Amino acid sequence: MRKFWVALSSIEEIDSSFIQRLFNYFGDIESVFNASDLSGIEGLSVKKAENFLRLRDRVDVDKVYQAVVDRGINFLTFDDGNYPLMLRNIDDPPSVIYYKGNLSDCNFDRTLAVVGSRRATSYAREALSQIISELNGTDICIVSGLASGIDTTAHVSALDNNLKTIGVIASGFDYTYPAANKELYKRIEDGSGAVLTEYYPTFQPIKFRFPQRNRIVSGLSYGTLVAEASLKSGALITANLTLEQGRELMCIPGLITN
């Protein structure tokens, strides 16, 4: 059954919400992959149904599944009992979570998302580092997006203080973005935490995927800490998602001179 989830997630032209819609209708993922008639799905146009069937029938299930295995990538599917409950309960949960590292080491009852500017000020970085250092000795897991700036500070501070950390990336594992964080990826994967993504390994870090991944950052977490953000930033997108998901939202006060 797991390979059918992977096969569907390998189709770039569809997203998790569409896969979930089909899964909810048919009741199991193998039926989704083998279905020939989608006419009973309310609101699904004939054109979209035909396009999906055409794309699906091109997929070599065993080949795309084996490509994940050969890369040493672990994964959880939406119907897996180990799929994080907090993430399952959001409006648009990822159909598959691909990951490297030790996801099972993370306490999903003690998760804190950290978001902020890629061009963070020294004040924001220092304030965040101090806050995270005071969590040393707890089992809190820091969740962020492995971008430059605040994300990097959050992950490094977590690791330096013996905390678990999860990096949620906006591409498949064939890509490292930003390239400057290659060693940080490895440090997380080899240490106390995991790097994860909803994207099949070959999917590139395209611009629209960055705001998409933000729902996972907040969705994995009981609360979100905004360290620093501009008015139209991805950090504020995550902040809004946090409120929509009914989670706690916190922020580091800015300098009164800023």
List the model feature ranges, each with a label:
Residues 78-258:
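Glycine-biased, small-residue-rich flexible motifs in mid-sequence functional cores and linkers
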Residues 1-134:
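Short, positively charged patches
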